[in-house]
């Protein structure tokens, strides 16, 4: 059983990496203003060497291009919710996202 530690900022990410957690979620939603910016994942990963830590990019992922971009900057997995729940064809949306990998 693993624990997923969620971070939002560079400071939080640095502290979590020092503590050697193996599973880290980078939330792309700014909790102060609720704005979503998927480049938050890239910013944090550029600042620190993730080593063997598995990175899950969370929030703001709406399609295959987002997944391809996040994968290219170092994310290992993705948490997708809203875009799947808002689509009329959930099966097609999940398939589209899956094949982006």
Language model feature labels by segment:
Residues 4-5, 58-59, 82, 86:
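Small/polar loops that bind or transfer phosphate-bearing groups
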Residues 36-39, 66, 89-90:
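Short capping/connector residues at structural and topological boundaries
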Residues 41, 45, 63-64:
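A short, acidic, amphipathic alpha-helical segment used as a generic capping/interface helix at domain edges
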Residues 9-20, 52, 57-80, 92-97:
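Catalytic cores of alpha/beta
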Residues 1-43, 50:
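Conserved anion-binding
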Residues 43-47, 71, 86-101:
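C-terminal helical cap(s) of enzyme catalytic domains, especially alpha/beta-barrels
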Residues 25-34, 73-94:
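Glycine-rich phosphate-binding active-site loops on the catalytic face of alpha/beta enzymes
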């Amino acid at each position: 059983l693993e624990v997923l530690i969620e971070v939002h900022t560079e400071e939080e990410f640095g502290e979590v990496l020092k503590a050697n957690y193996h599973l880290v979620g980078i939330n792309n939603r700014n909790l102060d203003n609720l704005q979503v910016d998927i480049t938050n994942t890239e910013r944090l990963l550029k600042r620190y060497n993730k080593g063997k830590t598995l990175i899950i990019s969370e929030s703001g992922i709406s399609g295959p291009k987002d997944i391809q971009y996040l994968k290219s900057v170092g994310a290992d997995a993705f948490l997708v919710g809203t875009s799947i729940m808002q689509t009329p064809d959930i099966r097609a949306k999940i398939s589209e996202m899956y094949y982006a990998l």
